[in-house]
Regions:
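Short, small-residue-biased leader/transition segments that mark boundaries at the very start
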Residues: 1-4, 8-15
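Glycine-rich phosphate-binding loops of nucleotide-dependent enzymes
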Residues: 13-254
Length: 254
């Protein structure tokens, strides 16, 4: 990955214009905007949850515009907005959820059978490393865990996959202060390790404190690109609300 710059562009459902940008290694790029302005459609097109109806999505130097979710996952980790719908299988155990995307790998499967001891050892390592608290350890059902620990489990699973791009969508929604701090620390740690982190957030404080670069989305379009050190919270809020816009010249990447 290194200095490679990836371009992700596609038309959102709210606009005929293209959303075009690059996510760089070693930075947290934040897509900021008020809920309902195309962020969900954008993420679904990027991650493969919805079909990409036009434009291109390039990742790790490959066009993945029409690739399956599994193929996209070869270069991308995804911390989804809805941890219950897209992040966990609530009636599965914690250890089953932690290997959801990896159970076919030789480490965990042989001859069509799951290596239960390997899965257990892997889950116990992640539980310890990421301080995932659950009443019965690896065999705890995901449904019975607190929201903060459910989110820790998702982050542990996605980060441990060690992919060059981490897509984190509203990763602190519904969490308490302590859990929010843990999520923020992990995203910064991954940025510092050279990963590209794409953060989608509605929270102004979160956007300003974590981002190296900010793109504001309004009605399905990128209406401004900012350095968080050079814009105030108040001004950023105006862009997010559509009261201001910093239009790019035609053909310029936003």
């Amino acid at each position: 990955y290194g200095d490679h710059r990836d371009l992700h562009s596609f038309p959102t459902r709210r606009s005929s214009d293209l959303v075009s940008f690059d996510a760089r290694a070693g930075e947290i790029l934040c897509i900021a905007g008020i809920d309902g302005n195309g962020q969900t459609e954008f993420i679904h097109a990027l991650t493969g949850l919805d079909k990409n109806n036009g434009g291109t999505v390039t990742l790790c130097g490959k066009d993945i515009s029409h690739a399956s979710i599994r193929r996209r996952g070869e270069c991308m980790s995804h911390i989804p907005e809805d941890r219950h719908k897209h992040g966990l299988v609530l009636d599965f155990t914690l250890e089953q959820n932690l290997v959801l995307q990896r159970y076919k790998e030789p480490e965990f499967e042989k001859g069509g059978f799951i290596k239960k001891d390997a899965v257990r050892a892997y889950a116990e390592r992640l539980i310890e490393e990421y301080d995932i608290r659950s009443g019965q350890g690896p065999v705890t059902t995901a449904r019975s865990m607190s929201g903060g620990n459910q989110q820790k489990a998702i982050i542990a699973r996605e980060v441990d996959r060690n992919k060059p791009l981490i897509v984190a969508v509203q990763p602190t929604r519904g969490l308490d202060v302590g859990a929010i701090e843990n999520v923020h620390k992990e995203l910064v740690k991954q940025r510092d390790a050279g990963k590209a982190v794409l953060l989608v957030s509605l929270e102004l404080d979160e956007v300003m404190s974590l981002s190296d670069r900010i793109l504001v989305m309004y009605e399905g379009e990128i209406v401004g690109e900012f350095d968080p050190k050079q814009i105030t919270v108040q001004e950023l809020g105006l862009y997010m609300a559509g009261a201001k816009r910093a239009d790019k010249k035609e053909g310029e990447t936003a």
